[in-house]
Amino acid sequence: MKIGIIAAMPEELVYLTQNLDKPQEVQVLGNTYYTGSVGNTEVVLVQSGIGKVMSAMSVAVLADHFQVEAIINTGSAGALAEGIAVGDVVIAYKLAYHDVDVTAFGYAYGQMAQQPLYFESDKEFIARIKENLSQLEQTWHLGLIATGDSFIAGDDKIASIKTHFPDVLAVEMEGAAIAQAAQALGLPFLVIRAMSDNANHEASISFDEFIIEAGRRSAQVLLAFLKALD
């Protein structure tokens, strides 16, 4: 299986490129893609850029140009639920948009028109990564991740998201868009995020301090998953 891997920022990608076997750089539409393998699994890595549009574009390129058979998103996120600490990993069982509102047409808040409210990760991938995580010294959680084109850094914003999604575990800026694009193209997907901050008023300071470590932890979980696919 050839897997496309998307990270939004260089800090979220660097640990993966350092652990890529037989890496090669390929330029497509002005962006750099890294091909190679992890164990016996063929992969294509890309730094998409931040936000929903850039990440969804990368899904399309990975599918069309590189013919990947699955998509995995890795990187950092802000923790929203009690009991989730900076450094913990959250695996998205499902994802939703926290900034979409077409309720005037009868859709649920967060539901894009003509789309489901939730985008569910591939069940086989979830089962496999749970097995991997049981063997790693890494605190992890499985649940809902919310996506929007905002960096969440305040209690009022947290409260707003939780009003609509009380079971949300973490928030970030790409996952649901990647999931929607992958689902539209018939590709199984998985989203792995390590917590860089708590999305509160100190989030920007915490993010700057912990983004590299969050990227590394998320990548470590992903690498263990890929090697187990051998």
Model-derived features: where do they sit?
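Metabolite-binding pocket within alpha/beta catalytic cores that recognizes anionic/polar moieties
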Residues: 1-123, 127, 132
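Short loop/turn motifs at secondary-structure junctions
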Residues: 2, 67, 85, 141, ...
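His/Asp/Glu-rich mid-to-C-terminal helical/loop segments that flank catalytic regions of hydrolases
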Residues: 200-230
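Active-site-proximal beta-strand elements of phosphoester/diester hydrolases
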Residues: 44-48, 146, 192
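Zn-dependent metallopeptidase/amidohydrolase metal-coordination segment
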Residues: 178-209
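Active-site rim beta-loop-alpha module in soluble metabolic enzymes
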Residues: 105-170, 177, 181, 185
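Conserved catalytic block of serine-dependent lipid acyl chemistry
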Residues: 75, 173-185, 217-219, 226
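Glycine-rich beta-alpha junction loops
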Residues: 9, 78, 95, 147-150, ...
